[in-house]
């Protein structure tokens, strides 16, 4: 049963706060102190029954007993609730249900300091020692409390069992005051008002005061006020007597704070007004942001010494710290103004960069540009550039403490905005007023820092744009230079000729041109002694190039200059006037073979020797082919230099000669006579046989077949003579 109807906090909310305060994300067994204090206020305000609060903490111990870090943080939360939860919660916590579970199950089973496994595990041993230290501290705190004596009984049992309790750091300072936390009192039931003593009826209803627990009528319990000392942060119903006590206590506290803040000034109601304080803060901010033009900045005035109060009240520690901080800040400001140069005290003019002014005449109407001689233009050195930017004052950023103050003020204002009950008591919150004054003083500094950051961003953005433009121009200039360099690139001839420039990529090969392989000049042959004409543009029409086993090289005209190449019509005329011979068969085994008639006719018309000539051997009339006497060396001029129009090819070794193929025998008009002379007819053989046997007299005798020649015997056709073809002379 909850004490206050309409403001009951569910148990799920309490359990979620407990889980959040002892979260796994918090390392080293620590807890979130802010949420833990909210839990203690929730327990102390009696919004949730104390037994249910104890069972929620016990449930968290059950779920985290296997993790030493989470168990340590949960035990720290339980200890904080013991010191701030109120006496009604201590009664439930020191009951047999919670203490036996903590000692008999968690400590003796999982974290027993006598167990060897726990002793070897350092983390578990620390948790066991921490449980023993908590039981010892609670025993000292609950001393002479009859309702809390079960903790002391468990402590003596553990001592009798031989457990050693660690020495507590604050054991000698612990007393009953550690658990003296105010809690809402129990309600008193009565049939009449405790102030006017009017009996309660249907029209005069009964109300309880949350501060004292008494029963009052509507007339004497119409005030609402937060009870911070009892852990109640929202305004609740109080009686007239309790309201006057709370009001007098708050007024004394406010007057004490005002006397400490302004002890030399007389207390006046106008000075306490919030509007007056806001006006002073605005004037102070305007005075700080104002920049003098020609006047010297006056040094800050030293703060007047604090006059001791005649009442003899001791100064608060926070006020002493504030006075020390103000004195330290005054000394720093005075030291800064002494070190500030006189030139910087005059009107500050924003420096203008001269780095990009004289690159291009952007503004020729500028008088500084017209009056200045280009030869006398000052050069922008890095030192001068650094000196100009060194004169610019540096804006101080917000410190970490100032940022925390701003964030705290924002958080408090958001809480007040969401809670309408706190808005009525905002005038009585002295801490919030003091924090508001500090935030107002930080506003000019924050504006300066923001303006400096924006200017720095714009400057960096402008420099980035300039760098991008310059990089693009440089890339375009470099690309143009590279294209020009590649266009003028030349390749020298391997035979000492003039350089040949490449204009564009290699043209595609549209014809299959046979180019003889160059032969090293060191290789010589006795049978190649004549210098034949130069081979140029020999191609086989209608025949694809056959693989020869060697690398294919480009044609002659592919790597030559355009000025050295004759037109296509001139090339055809030169070919018809000066026909050239194909390459030797030793270089190209597979070549196009012309018919005998075409070869003979071409040789007779041009007066050139045939491709092959036959010579008579000593063994008989057998004709064997004879290779043409042509050199495979590049053609040379009269002065011994190589021809420039010769193909530019690397100097490879000559390939090995292949098996020559015999050309077809020449056929003339007397071929039938030759065949008849060499191979006589059957009639001639019969007549010759008859003449041989009968001497030409016996014609009726049957002729016999000629005898076949035996293997190894010399041929009997030596008398037969073949008609030799006369070899024409070679034109040199």
UniProtKB/Swiss-Prot annotation:
SMART domains: FYVE, UIM, VHS. Transmembrane segments: none annotated. Its main location: membrane. Pfam families: FYVE (PF01363), UIM (PF02809), VHS (PF00790), Vps27_GAT-like (PF21356). It is found in: Endosome membrane. GO terms for biological process: protein targeting to vacuole; protein transport to vacuole involved in ubiquitin-dependent protein catabolic process via the multivesicular body sorting pathway. Residues 273-292, 314-333 form the UIM domain. Keywords: Endosome, Membrane, Metal-binding, Repeat, Zinc, Zinc-finger. Residues 253-274, 289-318, 364-384, 491-732 are annotated as: Disordered. Residues 364-379, 524-541 have a biased composition (Low complexity). GO terms for molecular function: phosphatidylinositol-3-phosphate binding; ubiquitin binding; zinc ion binding. A zinc finger (FYVE-type) spans 187-247. Zn(2+) 2 binds at residues 209, 212, 239, 242. Gene3D superfamilies: 1.20.5.1940, 1.25.40.90, 6.10.140.100, Zinc/RING finger domain, C3HC4 (zinc finger). Residues 652-663 have a biased composition (Pro residues). InterPro entries: ENTH_VHS, HGS/VPS27, UIM_dom, VHS_dom, Vps27_GAT-like, Znf_FYVE, Znf_FYVE-rel, Znf_FYVE_PHD. Component of the ESCRT-0 complex which is the sorting receptor for ubiquitinated cargo proteins at the multivesicular body (MVB) and recruits ESCRT-I to the MVB outer membrane. Component of the ESCRT-0 complex composed of HSE1 and VPS27. Belongs to the VPS27 family. The FYVE domain is involved in the binding to phosphatidylinositol 3-phosphate (PtdIns(3)P) which is required for the association to endosomal membranes. Both IUM domains are necessary for efficient binding to ubiquitin. This is Vacuolar protein sorting-associated protein 27. It comes from Debaryomyces hansenii (strain ATCC 36239 / CBS 767 / BCRC 21394 / JCM 1990 / NBRC 0083 / IGC 2968). The gene is VPS27.
